[in-house]
Amino acid sequence: MTRYFSIVLSLLLAVSCVFLPVASARQQQHQPLDRIVAVVDDNVVLKSELDRAIHNVKSQYVGHEGQLPPDEVLQRQVLERLILIKLQVARAQTNGIRVSDDELNQAISSIAENNKTSVDGLRQKLVAEGISFPEFRQSVRDEITVHHLRQGFAQSRIVVSEGEVDTALAQANSGAQYHLQHILVSLPDGATSEQIAIAQKKINGIKSVIDKGELAFSAAAVRYSDSPNALESGDLGWRSLDEIPEAFAQMVQTMKPGQIVGPLRGTSGFQLLKLVEVRDSTAAAGPRQMATEYHARHILVRITDKQKEAQAKAKIDTLRARIAGGADFQTVARESSEDANNSNQGGDLGWFPSDAFGADFGNHVKALADGNVSEPFRSAAGWHIVQRLGTRQTDVTRENQRAQIRDTIGQRKLEESYERFLRELRSEAYVSLQIEEPADDHHTPSAAVTPATGAVLPAATKH
């Protein structure tokens, strides 16, 4: 599951989209004095932060402003996002998570590169848009901090068994993939009967305006959904059956493209689900994937308290000279190599990809011709000499497919678990809103109430 354990470029690109708006912030030159719009435990959200975040969202809908919800609803959605970011950053700091200046600078360099400019050029663009560079740096630092919090959450709580991978692989090789959208009307934990009734009325009202053709599903998602991906039209991306909760999977298989089902009741609230389109998973799989593997053997001389650097280097040089003088590599390895894992096998490492023992070791192996022996080189383990025995092309399609499926299942579990974690974090926090909130159903059409059952389908990374 390393794919979602590391900070990926998409995170940086997402940040760059948020903080480089299309429309100029100079339109907001005459701003009132800053004030607090929300108190979040020991932190605050300022009006300037909220205005800037709303402006950035609107800039991504230039020419499609009709898809946005009313300003007061958008304000509530964006403010809730900012509150969750504050809570996650605070929890990360409590957990000892820190973002170094080097990591932050690297992220900002990537953002600048994505915008086809230098860091200085990026700074000038931000200033021209009315955004101070220190504020931008802090925003990027917060984004990375939140990512590290999710990363640690995944490492400590998410487990994917080989059996789960086997089942999902069988489905992927014989099934379809489904492009889904959803709309969520959320419910708090321990919701009262009155809260449930209000949520049912709201979700049925949303379904009614969609059925009547008054709003497209995408526009309704942006306008009314409580899901974190509401402003992305509730898009859940492409999913195979293993990525869909069991309570929904059977139903999705019977749906036709364009069909909408729901309301469906789950632990997060009520939701509507739309099947956008279906595709053959084998068509999406792509060509077979081949990789070069190497067969080699090596001799290792370790550096220890008793065997210092100079002694280890002198010993490896002596062994290299013996082999150059005609001694058998395997015999020398059995007699003198200090790698207990393979010295008895004459230092044989078997077949391996070039990065199996680190990039530097792999580069030395790749630089050799078959049968040749390297000069001594240093690694973290000590001093080596290596003999390359052969190369081969290996089909790693299935291995990579298993890794991708393992990542996909892990990501689905992470989304489900992290969504629950965020709800708990929000419910346990002291949050005082210093801004007028619109009523939940102020802009939401109503309809007759009919209960529904089902699971929760969380937002997921698009494929």
Swiss-Prot record:
Residues 439-463 are annotated as: Disordered. It is an enzyme of class 5 (isomerase). One of its GO terms (cellular component) is outer membrane-bounded periplasmic space. Keywords: Chaperone, Isomerase, Periplasm, Repeat, Rotamase, Signal. Residues 175-277, 291-390 form the PpiC domain. The keyword Metal-binding does not apply. Pfam families: Rotamase, Rotamase_3, SurA_N. GO terms for molecular function: peptide binding; peptidyl-prolyl cis-trans isomerase activity; unfolded protein binding. Residues 1-25 form the signal peptide. It is found in: Periplasm. Chaperone involved in the correct folding and assembly of outer membrane proteins. Recognizes specific patterns of aromatic residues and the orientation of their side chains, which are found more frequently in integral outer membrane proteins. May act in both early periplasmic and late outer membrane-associated steps of protein maturation. This is Chaperone SurA.
